[in-house]
């Protein structure tokens, strides 16, 4: 009985092998090369990890990651650090000479600047405008009285 049950599997293997032989014969070498490149690209991009970035590629990556905040080439140091410093490593040392990831790039982004609220801008404009108008009014008034001419505002 073992031979009878294995007969369909042998038949399937034979037919499948014949099918592959025909398909491989029809497929040209350029198709095989294209298929191999697609498979390599897919497998390498799926497992992409840290990579080295130098020159314009490094700057482009920092601009993309940091956006409008900007970035530093050296890590910003805190206030009150001792006068004896260890040699600083910059983004070039970390990402060009060695590989770095997205988190490492983000460490070199400048901090977000606190945005002024709309209310404080309105309050500032409100206090600035009368002062400027008052100065113009005083200048025009002094001209008008000195030259006996009537100036209109």
Curated annotation (Swiss-Prot):
InterPro entries: IGF-I, Insulin-like, Insulin-like_growth_factor, Insulin-like_sf, Insulin_CS, Insulin_family. Residues 120-153 are annotated as: Disordered. Residues 125-138 have a biased composition (Basic and acidic residues). Keywords: Cleavage on pair of basic residues, Disulfide bond, Growth factor, Secreted, Signal. Disulfide bonds join 54-96, 66-109, 95-100. Gene3D superfamilies: Insulin-like. Residues 142-153 have a biased composition (Polar residues). The insulin-like growth factors, isolated from plasma, are structurally and functionally related to insulin but have a much higher growth-promoting activity. May be a physiological regulator of [1-14C]-2-deoxy-D-glucose (2DG) transport and glycogen synthesis in osteoblasts. Stimulates glucose transport in bone-derived osteoblastic (PyMS) cells and is effective at much lower concentrations than insulin, not only regarding glycogen and DNA synthesis but also with regard to enhancing glucose uptake. May play a role in synapse maturation. This is Insulin-like growth factor 1.
């Amino acid at each position: 009985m073992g031979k009878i049950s294995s007969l369909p599997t042998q038949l399937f293997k034979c037919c499948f092998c014949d099918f592959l032989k025909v398909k491989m014969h029809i497929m040209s070498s350029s198709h095989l090369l294209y298929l191999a490149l697609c498979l390599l690209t897919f497998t390498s991009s799926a497992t992409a990890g840290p990579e080295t970035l130098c020159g314009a590629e490094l700057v482009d990556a920092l601009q993309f990651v940091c956006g409008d905040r900007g970035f530093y080439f050296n890590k910003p140091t805190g206030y009150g650090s001792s006068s004896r410093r260890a040699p600083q490593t910059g983004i070039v040392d970390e990402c060009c000479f060695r590989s770095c990831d997205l988190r490492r790039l983000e460490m070199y982004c400048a901090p977000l600047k606190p945005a002024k609220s709309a209310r404080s801008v309105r309050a500032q404009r409100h206090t600035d405008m009368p002062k400027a108008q008052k100065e113009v009014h005083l200048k025009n008034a002094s001209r008008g009285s000195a030259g006996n001419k009537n100036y209109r505002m």
